[in-house]
């Protein structure tokens, strides 16, 4: 619905399907065919998927699409992806502090965030960030531990966080409202 609306107003829109965190992956989890919500590598692959997509668009549609002035919108895990592309980096200290408490936490998004500790390599911001991204809208993002205050405060782009009051996976207070206060960019909005 959002992609159609933006396209109807003249925006070029791309809606990627991330195989490791798609509806098919969730269905496999619910049917007992997978043991994780998503493979840990998806925390790295999703931002890289977007960078790859922008590269392909630049190669094939450079006369029609300005890929040097891109806005990214993502929901839940996609919100994480959008913020990683904007320059938020995985905060290993925050994850090491929070994830041992996973079994007693009521924050279901930590199930995904704490998967980062299973990634076998250390990833730096430059690998996930994309300078072509100029603004971000993150809807119900999961950010509290994987980015934390230190990382979110480094984003310099305009950011809009959209929060819902009834999201059982990414609860509003710890995942959007408090993290909104960590943003230091001049252009920040909480909806």
Model-derived segments and spans:
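Conserved alpha/beta-hydrolase "acid-adjacent" motif
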Residues: 147, 168-175
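Alpha/beta-hydrolase active-site loop
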Residues: 28-29, 35-68, 84, 93-114, ...
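Short amphipathic alpha-helix adjacent to the substrate-entry channel of hydrolases
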Residues: 1-17, 23, 180-181
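Residue in the alpha/beta-hydrolase core beta-strand immediately N-terminal to the catalytic nucleophile
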Residues: 69-71, 135-137
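Catalytic histidine neighborhood in serine/cysteine hydrolases
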Residues: 183-191
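Short beta-strand immediately N-terminal to the catalytic nucleophile in serine-hydrolase-like folds
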Residues: 72-74, 162
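Gly/Ala-rich beta-loop-alpha elbow adjacent to hydrolase catalytic centers
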Residues: 74-78, 82
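Short beta-strand/loop motif that positions the catalytic acidic residue
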Residues: 155, 161-163
């Amino acid at each position: 619905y959002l992609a159609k609306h933006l396209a109807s107003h003249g925006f070029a829109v791309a809606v990627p399907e991330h195989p490791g965190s798609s509806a098919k992956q969730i269905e496999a989890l619910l049917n007992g065919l997978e043991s994780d919500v998503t493979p840990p590598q998806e925390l790295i692959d999703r931002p890289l998927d977007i960078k790859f997509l922008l590269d392909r668009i630049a190669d094939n549609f450079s006369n029609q699409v300005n890929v040097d002035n891109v806005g990214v919108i993502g929901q839940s895990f996609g919100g994480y992806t959008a913020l990683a592309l904007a320059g938020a980096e995985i905060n290993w200290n925050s994850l090491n502090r929070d994830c041992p408490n996973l079994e007693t936490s009521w924050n279901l998004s930590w199930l995904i965030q704490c998967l980062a500790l299973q990634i076998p390599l250390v990833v730096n911001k430059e690998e996930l960030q994309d300078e072509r991204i100029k603004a971000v809208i993150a809807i119900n993002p999961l950010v509290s531990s994987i980015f934390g205050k230190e990382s979110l405060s480094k984003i310099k782009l305009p950011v809009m966080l959209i929060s819902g009051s009834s999201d059982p996976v990414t609860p509003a207070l710890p995942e959007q409202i408090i993290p909104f206060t960590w943003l230091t960019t001049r252009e920040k909005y909480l909806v």
